[in-house]
Amino acid sequence: MVRVTLVNYTRRPLETITWAALVSYWDEWSTESFEKINEDDVKAHLPRILGYGHESILEHATFTFSIEGCSRVCTHQLVRHRIASYTQQSQRYIVLNEENVEETFVIPESIKKDRELYEKWKKAMAETIKLYKESLKRGIHQEDARFILPQAVRSKIVVTMNLRELKHFFGLRLCERAQWEIREVAWKMLEEIAKREELRPIIKWAKLGPRCIQLGYCPERELMPPGCFKRTRERWMKLLEKPL
């Protein structure tokens, strides 16, 4: 099971974004005016400014997540989003100690459905762990012993993105056509934001969702799975059930 946690974010993020936006055209703007920005100011200005497509202001708010238990297949996709900061568990310094195959590796459900194949996978992965540990016992350094480990090995990573990049990330990775594991991570990240009462409005105003939510239509119509727009929209709307 992948665990995603929003561990930190910009203090008063909506007020910060609004305050930054107002510097462009508010004569009374000052450093001190930040503390005067309130919820009414946010509601009065932020939806309108974002509605114009002026999204650079979103870069003034950042969010830091911890992601635990995903595979290196997933983290390799994650770090392709280059306007972000990443720090990942190192196989050079951390020794793989788990004996349980399920706790050590991510095994896709498609493999588990084929019982015979699943048993072969577990056997192969158990042999991988055995050979990895034998290499360490023979004096092979961790930085070399890790070469035997597959991409399925579970990892941990800390991710920091500004809100504009987070919107771009969600647009691509919440889509049903995204690979299943990173899609699961992306939904958990969005759900973590939705848990915070002060953050939930930005999901609606900035349209933090897959591209079909952001655009109002699917840009990959010919490729989309049947019914995915309806399913995705319903799941997204559930995050907004409480009044904004």
UniProtKB/Swiss-Prot annotation:
Any one Gene Ontology MF annotation carried by this entry is: NADPH binding
Residues of the ThyX domain: 2-207
Q: Where is this motif: ThyX motif?
A: 80-90
Q: Which residues cross the membrane?
A: none
Which BP terms does GO give this entry?
dTMP biosynthetic process; dTTP biosynthetic process; methylation
Pathway recorded for this protein: Pyrimidine metabolism; dTTP biosynthesis
Which reactions appear under catalytic activity for this entry?
dUMP + (6R)-5,10-methylene-5,6,7,8-tetrahydrofolate + NADPH + H(+) = dTMP + (6S)-5,6,7,8-tetrahydrofolate + NADP(+)
In which residues is FAD bound? 56, 80-82, 88, 162-164, 168
Q: Which cofactor does it need?
A: FAD
* Keywords, in A-Z order: FAD, Flavoprotein, Methyltransferase, NADP, Nucleotide biosynthesis, Transferase
Quote the record's binding site residues for dUMP.
77-80, 88-92, 146, 173
- The EC number(s) given in the record are 2.1.1.148
What does the note accompanying the cofactor annotation read? Binds 4 FAD per tetramer. Each FAD binding site is formed by three monomers.
Q: Which residues form the active site?
A: 173
Pfam families (alphabetical): Thy1
Q: Does the keyword Flavoprotein apply?
A: yes
Tell me the NCBIfam families matching this sequence.
thyX
Which family is annotated?
Answer: Belongs to the thymidylate synthase ThyX family.
This molecule's function is given as: Catalyzes the reductive methylation of 2'-deoxyuridine-5'-monophosphate (dUMP) to 2'-deoxythymidine-5'-monophosphate (dTMP) while utilizing 5,10-methylenetetrahydrofolate (mTHF) as the methyl donor, and NADPH and FADH(2) as the reductant.
User: Subunit arrangement?
Assistant: Homotetramer.
Q: What is this protein called?
A: Flavin-dependent thymidylate synthase
Tell me the organism.
Pyrococcus abyssi (strain GE5 / Orsay)
Query: Upper lineage ranks?
Result: Archaea, Methanobacteriati, Methanobacteriota, Thermococci, Thermococcales
